[in-house]
Amino acid sequence: MHKDIKLVKETEIRKPIGSPFIVYFSSISNNTHRFIEKLGFQHKRIPVDITQSITVSNEYVLICPTYSGGGNQVEGAVPKQVIQFLNNKHNRELCRGVIASGNTNFGDTFCLAGTVISKKLNVPLLYQFELLGTKNDVEQTQKIIANFFQNSN
């Protein structure tokens, strides 16, 4: 995990109510999309095309890849499409947690997008996984999300 993680106090965590719902971004490589498909939860994708936008009406966990070059190159860690989505106050207020993907080849910036979003929105960073994720990552993410939602089916 990234060394700059802000710990969200238990009393500050706003657990979602209802069935698990995921909002995610995946580039044209579809790495994150393939991971999401394995989870089996209802989901909505943030469009790759920056001119398109979405609005959500459910509380959600955001799953976001990290874009940065490693080392001191931290600019652009959060994809522009995700920033645009979160700049919508309504969308931002419904986010309850974040899960990040990344590449361990980039060292300290591994899953940095999750750290950035967690700090900015004051939501917990629930999990991190590399690239496409492993079978264990899928299972752990399923458990984390199901437990995080108070009334999951």
Swiss-Prot record:
Source taxonomy: Bacteria, Bacillati, Mycoplasmatota, Mycoplasmoidales, Mycoplasmoidaceae
Cysteines paired by S-S bonds: none
Organism: Mycoplasma genitalium (strain ATCC 33530 / DSM 19775 / NCTC 10195 / G37)
Full protein name: Protein NrdI
A GO biological process held by the record: protein modification process
PANTHER family, sorted: PROTEIN NRDI
Purpose: Probably involved in ribonucleotide reductase function.
Domain of life: Bacteria
Coiled-coil boundaries: none
Family: Belongs to the NrdI family.
InterPro entries listed in its UniProt record: Flavoprotein-like_sf, RNR_Ib_NrdI_bac, RNR_NrdI
NCBIfam families: nrdI
GO molecular function: FMN binding
Pfam families, per the entry: Flavodoxin_NdrI
